Amino acid sequence: MRRTAVAVLAAVMTLAVVPPAASASADGPVVSTDKGAVRGKVTERVRTFGSIPFAAAPVGANRWRDPQPVTAWRGVRDATTPAPACAQTSQLGQPASETEDCLYLNVTTPAQRSHRTRPVMVWIHGGGFTAGAASMYDPSWLAANNDAVVVTVNYRLGVFGFFGHPGLPGSGAFGLADQQAALRWVQRNARAFGGDARNVTVFGESAGGLSVCAQLASPRAAGLFAKAIIQSGPCGLTLPSFTTPGEFTGVWRSRADTEKAGTGTLGCADLACLRAKPVAELLTVHEQFASPSYDTAVLPIDPVIAQRTGRIHRVPTLVGSTHDEMTLFAPLFWPQPIPESAYGDQLAWIFGADAGEVAARYPVNGNDDARDEIARVLTDRSWACTSQTTRAELGRYTRVSGYEFADPDVPMIFPGFPPFPDYGAYHGSELLMLFDLGQTLTPAQRQVSDYVIAEWGRFARTGDPGWRAPVQSLAPGAIGGTDFALDHQCGFWSSIL
């Protein structure tokens, strides 16, 4: 989340144009899109097409402008390398990018011919709205095992995607507009890759899940998808401000607040000055613009209000989280162990007058490091019970299913993290079940991965993930219904919020 969010960032790839091929085939390496032909790669299991432009380069006059149409090309465009990462700073030792020309997507399909159109799954990556890239995620398992077309998309981040300024059309919502441009590309081109434009599932994790919340609330997204999956991005997510005891702040920001924040940025009095700034200089204020804005044409109202009042696209929706979301962030906020004697003071800093009730409900466990208790408290308060609220409120208007990824021994996918009492099923850990991230899974974890891939695919085809429990626990040897609200003490949290 925000500046402390962790994302494994992709290396920047180059794109070239190659000579035209003799013909284009729906199940071969060359496919004709609405703007020109692309040549990808074919393996025994999948076809992959990388760096396909879905909007014009957002540079020069197009910086801080809604995505513009791509100019058609002649010949066959090379699509054998993944999309480059959008401009972003280095986070936790991961590489930065200064690539502003980044509005590309990647397509993965099964290699074999199909006589019927396939469901399409469009992935929106996470990274706190300031980091991440489509090319981080290899969806080969999802595509091949589910006979699906999987599209991973880039969108502008941070100061390039969510900047605002008085008089600037689209202030604070350019990244969301990019996601919609990618979804419109899918509507126009799904069939060329064997996909069914009438059966598109949009799914994402963390900031990607929050993006799905925004698209559910955006009138401009009408008809662009038929199903939605929100992974660890509950629409009403709030986190401690760490400035005022008891104050929690949400993700979404009004357009007026975003424009106020953008006024005078880098000493510029107008947009012409800002558009002339090099990428590297703009990246010095990158993390200041990590909140999508409502009161905009793309997002007219706060998604929290939209979900509560039913002003959403009423499509089948799957909403879930991991059992130990906050363990990923706790060592970033608190790098050193916290003596249990200081537990009460830390809770007072976070919860103000409610700290005593929280401490009584969540006692220390005797390991003389209170960070794991704090992580559990914030997992329940900020992530789990907010996910439960998202399910309940969306469920008044559309069909909603739930899951919780709960493997306590899942491998760590983020390199270089400091020691912590128990990471458990940390934020982002379920990604290992869906994508090939280069980690080795045990046979039992592989079985969970196979189950998750199959049920995500079932949901993409039918809108039904295949279980009847309100919340399905996903863990080795323990796949089945769980009393989620009781486990995460959501009754307690609703009583004090």
Language-model segments: which ranges?
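Secretory targeting and sorting signals
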Residues: 1-24
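Non-catalytic accessory segments of hydrolases
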Residues: 25-172, 442-455, 460-467, 492-495
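Substrate-access "cap/lid" subdomains that shape
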Residues: 91-93, 188, 222, 231-346, ...
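Mobile gating loops/cap/lid regions near enzyme active sites that modulate substrate access
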Residues: 98, 384-497
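Alpha/beta-hydrolase active-site loop
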Residues: 102, 171-191, 254-260
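Active-site loop->helix "elbow" adjoining a glycine-rich segment at hydrolase catalytic centers
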Residues: 126, 174-178, 206-209
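Alpha/beta-hydrolase fold nucleophile elbow
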Residues: 193-206
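Short glycine-enriched nucleophile-adjacent loop
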Residues: 209-221
